[in-house]
């Protein structure tokens, strides 16, 4: 199968690509980002590096024809372009909204006509994202509602696609990995777990889940953190690997 990984230079995307390189069901990986995507470290002896193609797109609001040609015929897209809560302070909220919502809508609208049928579109959101604006969380409320709007946009587009698009919304809590948690991040994660009540998932688990759903089919449209841990753990166990 041909897989698009959008936002391919990011923290989770790097692990998605690393695992995908060793997945025999995936024959082509288009790594879509603003800058070139490097081969992940520790790809492993079973990795087929020839499957990976870096696709640079300078403007996610308007895809040039050269980029569209690279994406054509894809069977699935794992969408990992977003602004995290820690990045919010570095930009105006309208800019964060554009990156999270507008880029996603333009992406699915651009890819779908070019893709195979069915086209599995996996959008990575967050555990506290809220589709119902009347239930706005008390922490980062506007951000959580905006991310919920992104989820709804993907689901609404898929519902109107006459079966062309099979959507999946992944809602992870805190994403952890070996070596990531220094003193500052330990404090942040403690606050996230105790104050906000965020669950935790390993980076290897969410990556394995996204790949499993892209290759084998969508179990359900919304995957909560507990689903990511369960599916990812089973997928890693089946491949003989362990979670990070």
Language-model region placement:
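Oxidoreductase cofactor-interface core, primarily capturing Rossmann-like NAD(P)-dependent enzymes
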Residues: 8-11, 16, 39-41, 129-244
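N-terminal Rossmann NAD(P)H-binding glycine-rich loop of SDR-like oxidoreductase domains
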Residues: 1-26
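Residues at the starts of beta-strands that form the adenosine-phosphate
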Residues: 2, 25-28, 118-120, 166
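Conserved Rossmann-fold NAD(P)-dependent oxidoreductase catalytic core, especially the SDR/UDP-sugar
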Residues: 90-98, 102-145, 168
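N-terminal Rossmann-fold cofactor-binding loop
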Residues: 30-36
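SDR active-site strand-loop-helix element
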Residues: 6, 32, 80-81, 121-127, ...
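Acidic-histidine catalytic/liganding microenvironments
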Residues: 23-24, 49, 157
């Amino acid at each position: 199968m041909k897989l698009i990984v959008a936002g391919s230079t990011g923290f989770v995307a790097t692990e998605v690509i690393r695992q995908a390189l060793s997945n025999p069901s995936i024959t082509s990986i288009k790594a879509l980002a603003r800058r070139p995507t490097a081969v992940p470290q520790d790809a492993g002896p079973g990795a087929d590096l020839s499957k990976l193609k870096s696709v640079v797109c300078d403007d996610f609001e308007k895809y040039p024809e050269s980029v569209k040609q690279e994406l054509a015929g894809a069977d699935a897209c794992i969408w990992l372009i977003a602004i995290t809560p820690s990045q919010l302070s570095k930009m105006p909220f309208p800019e964060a909204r554009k990156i999270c919502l507008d880029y996603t809508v333009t992406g699915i609208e651009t890819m779908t006509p070019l893709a195979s049928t069915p086209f599995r579109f996996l959008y990575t959101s967050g555990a506290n994202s809220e589709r119902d604006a009347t239930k706005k969380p008390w922490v980062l409320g506007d951000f959580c509602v905006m991310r919920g709007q992104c989820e709804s946009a993907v689901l609404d587009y898929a519902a109107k696609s006459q079966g062309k698009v099979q959507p999946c919304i992944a809602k992870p809590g805190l994403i952890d990995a070996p070596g990531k948690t220094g003193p500052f991040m330990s404090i942040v994660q403690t606050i996230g777990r105790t104050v906000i009540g965020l669950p935790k998932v390993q980076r290897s688990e969410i990556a394995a889940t996204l790949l499993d759903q892209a290759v084998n089919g969508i179990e359900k449209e919304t995957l909560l953190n507990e689903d990511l841990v369960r599916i990812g753990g089973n997928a890693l166990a089946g491949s003989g690997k362990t979670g990070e």
